[in-house]
């Protein structure tokens, strides 16, 4: 199957798929962690950006089961990446926050992400990158 060279005739889906594949390959070749998958790193990174998260927040955000997130949080806790504490406003909820080790781990990932973004945007102007970010933000808010 050949693709039309006119970008207007190609689905956005195709570009997203290509970017995901490109990032996955870059991640695999630049981070050698047998303990965390790319998906698991995404969850760890989200906890970092949120500052504090709940299990429910993560289930909703990643559209996965509560059991999956519970198992993953246990793994993160066992590896020393997160700490959980009781929510003072609702004692049934646990608040999740990165430890110093979790911050160190995500720092390494952020560096890889930045290097990949620099690579894929090398031929794009700062204005185009800004526009791309604005458009992607709008798309993800739907």
Residue positions per predicted region:
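Charged, amphipathic alpha-helical coiled-coil/dimerization segments
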Residues: 24, 75-134
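N-terminal leader segment of winged-helix/HTH proteins
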Residues: 1-34
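N-terminal helix-turn-helix DNA-binding core of bacterial DNA-binding proteins
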Residues: 21, 25-68
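Alpha-helical transmembrane segments and membrane-interface helix-loop junctions
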Residues: 50, 55, 95, 137, ...
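Active-site phosphate/pyrophosphate-handling residues
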Residues: 11-14, 42, 57, 130
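C-terminal regulatory/oligomerization modules of transcriptional regulators
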Residues: 1-5, 126-142
């Amino acid at each position: 199957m050949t693709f039309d060279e006119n970008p207007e005739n190609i689905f956005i889906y195709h570009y997203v798929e290509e970017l995901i594949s490109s990032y996955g390959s870059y991640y695999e070749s630049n981070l050698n962690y047998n303990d965390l998958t790319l998906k698991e790193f995404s969850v760890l990174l989200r906890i970092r950006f949120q500052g504090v998260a709940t299990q429910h927040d993560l289930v909703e955000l990643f559209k996965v089961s509560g059991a999956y997130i519970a198992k993953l949080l246990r793994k993160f806790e066992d590896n020393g990446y997160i700490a959980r504490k009781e929510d003072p406003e609702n004692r049934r909820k646990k608040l999740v926050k990165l430890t110093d080790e979790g911050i160190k781990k995500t720092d390494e990932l952020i560096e890889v992400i930045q290097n990949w973004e620099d690579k894929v945007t090398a031929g794009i102007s700062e204005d185009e990158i800004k526009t791309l970010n604005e458009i992607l933000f709008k798309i993800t808010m739907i």
